[in-house]
């Protein structure tokens, strides 16, 4: 019997082919009616899910690019701010140095002016002392001339003697 069954499978009869075809068509109808819809729905859902995943990935990529651009802009701004702070610090240091130079120059100029004023006062005091001494000598010489009514030679001699008594420094 197994041989007969095996024989019938190898050499199929028309009836067997007919019933196999009918069974296959019924299977296709049942599959189409009950299986095809859920399978296609499942495939469509999976396709939509994949599309959403791709869309979310693209959105995440765009968001990452935007964040990267913001970070780059923030880095550039921070770099510019740092450069500006350095420039301001250099300018402040230069300004402070110039102010100190000007202050030192003013102090030196004031010291020079004070020294010159002191020298001028000393000079005026020395000149006044010299005038007083010359006036005293002139008065003394005039007194001697008046006391001694002298001739021109004697007068010249008295003036020369008075000048010799005058200190040379």
Curated annotation (Swiss-Prot):
Entry's Gene Ontology cellular component terms: plasma membrane; proton-transporting ATP synthase complex
Quote the Gene3D superfamilies the UniProt record gives. F1F0 ATP synthase subunit B, membrane domain (1.20.5.620)
Membrane protein topology class: Single-pass membrane protein
Q: Mind listing the GO molecular function terms for this protein?
A: proton-transporting ATP synthase activity, rotational mechanism; proton-transporting ATPase activity, rotational mechanism
Sorted keywords for this record are: ATP synthesis, Cell inner membrane, Cell membrane, CF(0), Hydrogen ion transport, Ion transport, Membrane, Transmembrane, Transmembrane helix, Transport
Chief location category: membrane
Residue ranges of the region described as Disordered: 69-107
Coiled-coil annotation: which residues? none
Question: Where in the sequence does UniProt note compositional bias of the Basic and acidic residues kind?
Answer: 87-107
Q: How does it assemble?
A: F-type ATPases have 2 components, F(1) - the catalytic core - and F(0) - the membrane proton channel. F(1) has five subunits: alpha(3), beta(3), gamma(1), delta(1), epsilon(1). F(0) has three main subunits: a(1), b(2) and c(10-14). The alpha and beta chains form an alternating ring which encloses part of the gamma chain. F(1) is attached to F(0) by a central stalk formed by the gamma and epsilon chains, while a peripheral stalk is formed by the delta and b chains.
PANTHER family, alphabetically? ATP SYNTHASE SUBUNIT B, ATP SYNTHASE SUBUNIT B', CHLOROPLASTIC
General function of this protein:
F(1)F(0) ATP synthase produces ATP from ADP in the presence of a proton or sodium gradient. F-type ATPases consist of two structural domains, F(1) containing the extramembraneous catalytic core and F(0) containing the membrane proton channel, linked together by a central stalk and a peripheral stalk. During catalysis, ATP synthesis in the catalytic domain of F(1) is coupled via a rotary mechanism of the central stalk subunits to proton translocation. Component of the F(0) channel, it forms part of the peripheral stalk, linking F(1) to F(0).
Name this polypeptide is given: ATP synthase subunit b
What are the leading ranks of the lineage? Bacteria, Pseudomonadati, Rhodothermota, Rhodothermia, Rhodothermales
The gene name on file is atpF
């Amino acid at each position: 019997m197994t041989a007969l069954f095996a024989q019938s499978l190898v050499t199929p009869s028309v009836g067997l082919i007919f019933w196999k075809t009918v069974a296959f068509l019924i299977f296709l109808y049942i599959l189409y009616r009950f299986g095809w819809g859920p399978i296609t729905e499942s495939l469509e859902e999976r396709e939509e899910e994949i599309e959403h995943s791709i869309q979310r990935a693209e959105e995440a990529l765009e968001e990452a690019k935007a964040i990267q651009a913001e970070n780059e802009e923030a880095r550039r701004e921070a770099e510019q701010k740092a450069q500006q702070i350095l420039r301001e610090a250099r300018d402040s240091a230069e300004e402070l140095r110039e102010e100190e130079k000007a202050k030192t120059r003013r102090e030196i100029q004031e010291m020079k002016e004070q020294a010159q004023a002191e020298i001028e006062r000393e000079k005026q005091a020395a000149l006044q002392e010299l005038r007083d001494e010359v006036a005293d000598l002139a008065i003394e010489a005039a007194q001697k001339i008046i006391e001694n009514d002298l001739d021109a030679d004697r007068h010249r001699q008295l003036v020369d003697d008075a000048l010799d008594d005058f200190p040379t420094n």
